[in-house]
């Protein structure tokens, strides 16, 4: 018995070795739990039932076919995928009479719409014309009164990618759902299900937008959007429109998500968008956005291929789609009868706060989270203050000094400042892109450095003021209380923001603060209870040996820090070990919450350091915040860690310095991502083409291009110019011309612009609208962009900042000889069709750009414009014709990639072949080749 008691005392006594053991076990447990939670292999099981195995097998076969070629909207690979999907859909729907199929390829669902954005403080209005070939399936439910559920994914890729994750797995999952509900053993669902296999998401979210004009969109109230903004791994719940629909994600078998990502999207920290935006903002639907989210350096590159994907990733998305669909369609849900007057309906419209842990899903409305936060904010001081009054007002048994109270916040502030200096003064200058390859190594270095700094500063202060010490001051409890107050203040701010949660100022991902604050408060109150019951001190103090533990529910820390452990019988005679209760209350759970949140954020966005300087600055701030936050739960106990732990911190920091100086930022597993386009400017030359590559400044971009054979053979220079936000554009004249138009003798054959109508009569000038009309002839093409601006000569006298173009017209076919020019005032604002079925869009503020997307490879674009002449008083009298002119810049894109001898873009193939293995390639625009020409009307 004595040996057992001695063992327990040696483990749980407040000793350096005991504390260090607790710390090590805590970090091992946290890392292990987080790994199990985030691991695809340990958290997702492949199906065991024969039916689901068959579904997964067929979906995997479908994915292999989808990813056979790059399949951007402007490539023949897109037609291949469309036709393959159509054949699979037609085969599946033939089994059930209540399943319908429609193909937008019949030109019944073409759309035209405008979108306004802010560029450099100026309003920019773009109008898009899009010819849809969505594949839409409707599985009619038995209860026609129930609103329908939409499942959506897009079947196009970017030109540089095979689109396995983005969004082949989403499409394969939709096919899996279709196979399930058209299978012989599956009963007809009660709720109607609509499946939208949409096209051209990548450069305008066009497929989702066109679906809203489809007749089957009527009656749809809910949606599940399946996406990919990474390349494999687990599919995460990015965001939900509200709590009402998000809570149903709890029923899927492998839920994975956190509202931290939702906060990032809603606050525009993540710049890429998905079809979710269209369904929510334009369609007014309620739904979820489920997507793969990492790694970003393979996203939109050739690395997003079938070789880099695990079948478990597909099953994770497919199983979640099957489960969510089954939950929503098996009968009525409370959202079907939502009334704004009911309390449940009000909470259903709240933003959702959600997270998952080991396949358990937790979701709450923001209103409930706010109430819980307010209750906690009231309870903490309400309980703590009476104990403080008892301790300092009645018993007066806790004597504090200014040094005791201020040393922890001083240490925290100095350590944070030094850590920032270390980051921005050493890491960034020596290896600024290191977060791309080693984000968690940096977190470990910063974490160890921050702990070490606090250990040295706190114990240094103790050493300086050792002669002024008060024996029973309990610096551990002081640090716990001060940390609790810090969390309390942060929770006030977060709660105030969450109570008024809006898009652009979303705080739904800050829920861990509630738990951190509560845990810290419990530990501090526990310590205050101990002091409240501690006897009033005698007239003199007795110094207690360092290795003795604290009295029952109290503490008697001394300043012999740094002294060796005394491995003898001098343990606590009264058997109290309340420090362990405080440690177990604070450190394990707090550390997991902070690590899990930080891991997800860093793992999701660290690759975006290659996208901009703003992203780089954000990532380094997040790394420092992560390291500091991860340290805080341990800081109240940092006084007591033993020498070996301190030595480990020192070694990590020291080795970290060498690591930062020598580690590679880019490697095979974490490549440098560069963006390519080959461009021809016919205004300058019909014979020359240039390659433009965009990447980060100070990256190996210029070195990579200088080593390409055609560049060295031509002895041409690679010219690099800074563009925006830490990016640079490096270009060189290419000797490898694209081969996209058979029989073309020069690049003039790629793009011809015929001016059909140069202007209207000047009868009403300068007070009437001028009109112009052009035909754009571009063989083997689907995508062109027109930019409008006044003529250079007009700019001198123009008093207007807005675009002069007020109306654009896309002619459906050959213009009728009897067609009369439509009077401007008779055209309604926004989109309309004239009597001949031509597509018309009018915006009196001005139209800066027209984006054209068509399906017929060889059909010409036929476009008309109406614009306001620019004039001044001088112009009215002199009627200078120069002020009537309009420049129309036409740029057309090609995305067709051949292989080997049939290579259509040899300059791109050369870069793929000769670049170092640490480089991955993506497109920088709609296509991989662009040809431009400017005409003046």
UniProtKB/Swiss-Prot annotation:
Alphabetized InterPro entries for the sequence: Fxna-like_M28_dom (IPR048024), M28_fam (IPR045175), Peptidase_M28 (IPR007484), PFF1_C (IPR053975), PFF1_TM (IPR053976)
Cofactor note: Binds 2 Zn(2+) ions per subunit.
Topological domains annotated Vacuolar: 38-373, 429-437, 497-510, 602-618, 665-937
Chief subcellular location: membrane
GO biological process, one term: proteolysis
Cytoplasmic side: 1-16, 395-407, 459-475, 532-580, 640-643
Keywords recorded for this protein, A-Z: Glycoprotein, Hydrolase, Membrane, Metal-binding, Metalloprotease, Protease, Transmembrane, Transmembrane helix, Vacuole, Zinc
Family: Belongs to the peptidase M28 family.
UniProt-recorded name of the protein: Vacuolar membrane protease
Organism the protein comes from: Scheffersomyces stipitis (strain ATCC 58785 / CBS 6054 / NBRC 10063 / NRRL Y-11545) (Yeast)
Phylogenetic placement of the source organism: Eukaryota, Fungi, Dikarya, Ascomycota, Saccharomycotina
